[in-house]
């Protein structure tokens, strides 16, 4: 039996109302995609072309106007479809009073990871993203690039089968961008 697609999008449309009497905005029109397990897939397009909206629909963060999205064969609108997904949004928000290690640990606990293995996982991930030396610094003192790296670590914390990254190298210096590409 074939494995379900990691991500499948069928005839996706998403429109947004912009105000009373104003025209609707067609963010996504008739997109079909089938991403198999193990594939790396990128979306390229100008600002405002619907890339982030498509990702949010795939993750069930916005409801499609028409069409459907699924993750490993489950509707993306079902809460359990996110159990095997790591997500780095375009502009992640983190609690500035937490340290890097506390932040990654926080997301690991949200994913149901237990304390002892989580502590080692946090150490490994901070090493992977090049922030082991900044693990005990508060995020309020991190640069934009460092915050993106923490975002990558939190997206990887539960060892997801599907990783969705929205502009993962935004604000990261060229060497950091290369490092993130190598992680991907």
Describe each region flagged by the PLM.
Residues 163-166, 172:
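Catalytic Walker B motif of ABC-type/P-loop ATPase nucleotide-binding domains
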């Amino acid at each position: 039996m074939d494995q379900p697609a990691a991500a499948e999008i069928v005839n996706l449309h998403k429109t947004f109302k912009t105000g009373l009497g104003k025209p609707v905005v067609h963010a996504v029109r008739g997109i079909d995609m089938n991403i198999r397990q193990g594939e790396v897939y990128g979306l390229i397009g100008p600002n405002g072309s619907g890339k982030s909206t498509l990702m949010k629909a795939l993750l069930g963060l916005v409801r499609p106007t028409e069409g459907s999205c699924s993750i490993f064969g489950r509707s993306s609108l079902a809460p359990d479809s996110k159990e095997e997904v790591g997500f780095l949004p375009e502009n992640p928000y983190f609690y500035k009073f937490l340290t890097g290690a506390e932040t990654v640990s926080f997301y690991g606990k949200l994913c149901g990871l237990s304390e002892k293995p989580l502590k080692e996982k946090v150490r490994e991930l901070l090493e992977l993203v090049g922030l082991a030396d900044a693990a005990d610094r508060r995020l309020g003192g991190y640069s934009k690039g460092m915050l993106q790296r923490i975002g990558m670590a939190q997206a990887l914390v539960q060892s997801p089968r599907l990783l969705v990254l929205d502009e993962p190298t935004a604000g990261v210096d060229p060497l950091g961008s290369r490092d993130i590409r190598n992680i991907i």
